Amino acid sequence: MMISLNDKQIQHLYWRTGFGISNHELKIVRKLSKDQIIDQIFIESTKASALSMDFGILEKHPKDLSVAERKQARQLRNKKMSELNILWFKQLTTTKEVLREKVTLFFHDHFAVRLRTPRACIHLNNVIRNHALENFGDMLMEVSKSPAMLIFLNNRQNRKNSPNENFAREVMELFTLGRDNQYTETDIKEAARAFTGWNFTQNGSYIFRKNHHDYGVKTVLGKTGNFTGEDIIKILLEQKQTARFICQKLYRYFVNDIINQNHIEILTNAFYDSNYNLKTVFNLMFKSDWFYDSKNIGTKIKSPIELMVGISKPFKVEYENPKVLLYLQRRLNQMLFFPPNVAGWPGGKAWIDNSTLMLRLKLASLTLNSGVIEWQDKIDIPENPMMSQQVYQKIKSKLQKKVKTEADWDIFLSNLESKNKIALTHLIIQPELSKAANRVVSNLDENDTKNFIIELMSLPEYQLC
C-alpha cells in the first residue's frame, strides 16, 4: 500500500533531514509516496563531497620554518580556520547531499573538537562526512585515530607508566556508553593503558608507536586480556548500551527532545542488530508513522546553523563579506569548529537567551533585506554625556555594518504556487501560530509578498522546526 505524506509532513521530513524544502521541490515530491521520497533523499546523499583547501606553509614541518615563517604560520592558521568555517557553511547551503551534511553536522557536535589546527579539523570533518550514512563503528575507530582527536584529548601524551585518561574517559562518557553507564573509574584507567602508543605522522597518518604502548594485561567492562585501543573500541561496541545511547541522541536531534522509550528500543534493536549501520536506523526512523506525529512537528528549536542555512538556502543568498557569517555564528553561540567544550553544544532551549533572541528574530530581515547590524568586535562606544551627538554618531557608524547580501527573490517568488496569507504561512512556518502571531499576520499586507515573507520569518514560530 502506497502511503502519501501531506505538505506539512513533507516539510517536517525535509527540515529534519536537512534545512527545509523549496516550493519548487515540494511540487515535485508531493507526487511521490512516503517511501519514494525517503529513498530519493538517501540516493541524493550517496556521494560524499569532501571539503578541500590549500594550506600553504602549514603543510611544512614546524622545524623547517624560519622565525618569520612561524609567525606567518600562526596568522595563516587563524585565517584558514575562518575560511574553513565559511567553506562548510557554503556547502551546507548549496549541497544536494543534504542528509549526509545534516548527519555530519550532528556528529560534528557528537565528536566535539575545539582546535585552531585547520588541517586536523578539515580531516576530521571529512572523516565524519565519509561515514555519516555508513557504519558508526568504522566512524568511531577512524575519528579516534584522527589527528584532531589525538591532539584535543591528549592521547599523544598517553604512554606506558604515564597514562593520560582524557580520551579513555570521553570515549565512554560522551562517544559510546553515556555518562555513568556501565563503566567505572577502574575501567577508564585500564582502557587508557590500552590506548597508549596512538599517534600520527607529520602528514597526518595514524601511527602506532610500539615503544610507548603498555603491553600488560588489562580488565575493561568485565573482560580481561592484553588489549589494544582497537580492542577497547570493539568491546564498547559490543555493549548494547552504546547503540541505545547513540539512538537517544539521534532521536533528540531528528525527532523530539522528549524521548519515547518504546521508539528508542525499536531503533536500538535495529541499530545493534545491523552492526551499527546508520542508514538502517535513519531509514527506520524516517519511514515510521510516529516520526510524522503532530507532537513531533514544529517542536524543535532550530540551532543557529539550521536557522542561518534555512534562511540562506531557499533564496540562494550570497554574502558580499562572508566574515559576517562568523560574526553571526559567534553572536548566536554556535560557531562551526568551535564547540564550547568536549560535550558539544547543549542545544534545545539553551539556544535561546536574552542576548540571542532579538538577533534570531531579526536575522531574516538582516539577511534578506541587507539590514544593519552592530559590529562590536574590538571597540565599544564610551558612555560620555558630554560627547557631541555628531561624534557619537561617527563612532556608532563605525560599529554598524550592513549585512550586504544578494538574495534571489525572483526565483523564490516565481516558484510560489499561491501568494495568499494561508498558503505562505503554511509554507514558511512549521508549528501552529499562537493567537498573538495570528493577530500580527492578519494585520500584514499580503500584496507586499516580499515583506510578508520576511515578517513571517521574523515570528517566534519560525524559530521552530
Which sequence ranges carry the predicted segments?
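Short, compositionally biased low-complexity segments
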Residues: 8-16, 56-61, 76, 162-166
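N-terminal accessory alpha/beta regions
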Residues: 24-122, 127-130
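Flexible, low-complexity segments enriched for small/polar residues
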Residues: 3-6, 11-25, 247-248, 252-274, ...
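A ubiquitous short alpha-helical element
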Residues: 70-74, 92, 155-158, 234, ...
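Cell-wall polysaccharide-cleaving catalytic domain and substrate-binding groove, primarily
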Residues: 2-49, 146-147, 158, 170, ...
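Active-site substrate-binding loop specific to GH73 endo-beta-N-acetylglucosaminidase modules
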Residues: 84, 120-317, 324
